[in-house]
Design a protein with these regions (language model features):
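Bacterial Sec-dependent N-terminal signal peptides
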Residues: 1-28
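N-terminal helix-cap/turn-to-beta initiation motif at the start of protein domains
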Residues: 18-34, 50, 120-127
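Intrinsic disorder/low-complexity segments enriched in polar/small residues
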Residues: 4, 97-98
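Edge beta-strands of extracellular beta-sandwich domains
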Residues: 113-118
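Central antiparallel beta-sheet cores of small beta-barrel/beta-sandwich binding domains
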Residues: 27-96, 102-112
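Solvent-exposed, non-transmembrane amphipathic alpha-helical segments
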Residues: 4, 75, 92, 121-123
Length: 127
């Protein structure tokens, strides 16, 4: 009887240890991702509406909404988006500690840092 109780106790203990030790794994998910592109001393507020294999781009300061994009690739922790009408491309990777995406926004041969986070509410704020 004591052997069964000890076995059960250690089994539960191991399950708890594995459950608590599991790292949170963030991934590129569908939704409205908002953030900023840092252009020198200025910040440009942008948004990406990811759905399925598609994506639309919004540039909030310029009031450009629903700009068509091409998703070049998308995997569990990164995405590459081409914006042909702006001659721009962005490559983003999930940051494991906070679930945001960071990367570079390239346009006309120049690169700028970009950071976006998943926004629960799709609101278009005026600058």
């Amino acid at each position: 009887m004591l052997k069964h109780i000890l076995f059960l106790f250690f089994t539960i203990l191991l399950l708890v240890i594995f459950a608590l030790g599991k790292k949170t794994h963030y991934q590129v998910v569908n939704g409205y991702w908002t953030g900023t592109v840092n252009i020198g001393k200025e910040c440009l507020h942008v948004a990406f509406n990811l759905s399925g294999n598609g994506c639309e781009f919004d540039c909030l300061e310029q009031k450009a909404y629903g700009v068509k994009t091409d998703v070049l690739y998308r995997n569990h922790d990164s995405i590459c988006i081409d914006i042909p009408s702006l001659n721009a491309q962005t490559k983003l990777t999930i940051i494991q500690k906070n679930g945001k995406m960071k990367g570079l926004f390239r346009q006309y041969g120049k690169s700028y840092p970009i950071e976006i986070g998943l926004n629960d509410i799709r609101t278009r704020k005026r600058p």
